[in-house]
Amino acid sequence: MGGGNSKEESSSPSSSSWASHQSYPQYGPDSYNYPPPPTYAPAPSPAPAPAPVPAPSPASSYGPQYSQEGYASQPNNPPPPTYAPAPSPASSYGHQYSQEGYASAASQPNYPPPPSQSQVADRKKFDRRYSKISDNYSSLLQVSEALGRAGLESSNLIVGIDFTKSNEWTGAKSFNRKSLHHLSNTPNPYEQAITIIGRTLAAFDEDNLIPCYGFGDASTHDQDVFSFYPEGRFCNGFEEVLARYREIVPQLKLAGPTSFAPIIEMAMTVVEQSSGQYHVLVIIADGQVTRSVDTEHGRLSPQEQKTVDAIVKASTLPLSIVLVGVGDGPWDMMQEFDDNIPARAFDNFQFVNFTEIMSKNKDQSRKETEFALSALMEIPPQYKATIELNLLGVRNGNIPQRIPLPPPVQSGSSFSSSRIPNFEPSVPPYPFESKQMSSADDIQLCPICLSNPKNMAFGCGHQTCCECGPDLKVCPICRAPIQTRIKLY
């Protein structure tokens, strides 16, 4: 420091003194009678510096760096007579040294602290107090106790069952290559799921009436649902649900594509007509929502978009949605739905992989308990959310009324009449034709949805449509693994 001035000031007593380095001879030790300040006159040589004054602070130190910056702009002013640091840094020369550093900070306005995450969340369309509710129960007893503590004395169950064509091959691994709707003395995955959920929620259902609907068959496709009984009457207990299911399955024609929007909208109609009673919609399905090969990455297919919109709309009602996945999957998109659907009043959607739980090496009773727990563990906080959001016990007034189609069966039921809800007479959107589709037309249609033309071929030579083909892992005709997909037109 100051090396360029040492030659001009060679007449000073000591070329290594502080004054010679600063080119200020008047600050030398012989220019004044004041004793040199003990803290700002240390020589830069290895000689030990004078003892510091008691209790020095970093701001009151007067080393060489300080003196060059502090006094370079004031060469004609003598130093003050004493340099003892003041007790406060604000009154010392340390404050003068750091004045440049603090000047900009002092001139800045006093901004408030940045908003917290909770404040940012308030700007969004849903309350994150009810978003991504943690899985914090470990037994069915805890679930029952939590339901009671939350005041859930009455919970109404709604059941929706997937009758799409993919049920015929998505049991290749998990159901011994049989259709997931195969009927025998052993309950199929749909019957197992209905039984476990029905037994668990039976204690909370006062009237024991269960609205049941099917979707994805040849009469509904991805547009409508059909009621298990004519005129939309409900089933009396889950035992009747199982019995009626066995009556319907042999007479159905599985089709597609898959969309959960119609069954969610039907459940919304049921909740609205009940004047806002709390309901749990259990959707049992073998696959996720149809996604066309033409759908760009990062975008949703029409079926996916309608399903997301329906889930968001359902969060304005006291309605929880539990999707039970049966069969081989895949279920990656359903996990995305469970975790990341935005813009909801509360977290109203829960996905449970039935196959994964029931394939564990455990006793059957323990697997059933684990499944019921996984399906219902989020019901208590979701029920609390409907109370705090003032959704319970009131009509929304802005819910479109969906009318279910009649069951696609010819025979009536032997069960006595239960309750007939106040639905308008159902009018099917598609005219029924008395004659069967010709075999020539059948050959040209996709064997999965039975509605779209065949426009995608696999390596084995068999064909489907471009909406159904991307979701397949094995050919639905010959069961060969699909490694090549070719769009025909």
From Swiss-Prot:
N-myristoylated. Interacts with the heterodimer UBC35/UEV1B. Interacts with ERF053. Interacts with PP2CA. This is E3 ubiquitin-protein ligase RGLG1. Residues 11-23, 58-75 have a biased composition (Low complexity). SMART domains: VWA. Its EC number is 2.3.2.27. GO terms for biological process: abscisic acid-activated signaling pathway; negative regulation of response to water deprivation; positive regulation of abscisic acid-activated signaling pathway; protein K63-linked ubiquitination. It comes from Arabidopsis thaliana. GO terms for cellular component: nucleus; plasma membrane. Residues 1-10 have a biased composition (Basic and acidic residues). It catalyses: S-ubiquitinyl-[E2 ubiquitin-conjugating enzyme]-L-cysteine + [acceptor protein]-L-lysine = [E2 ubiquitin-conjugating enzyme]-L-cysteine + N(6)-ubiquitinyl-[acceptor protein]-L-lysine. Pfam families: Copine (PF07002), zf-C3HC4_3 (PF13920). Residues 156-376 form the VWFA domain.
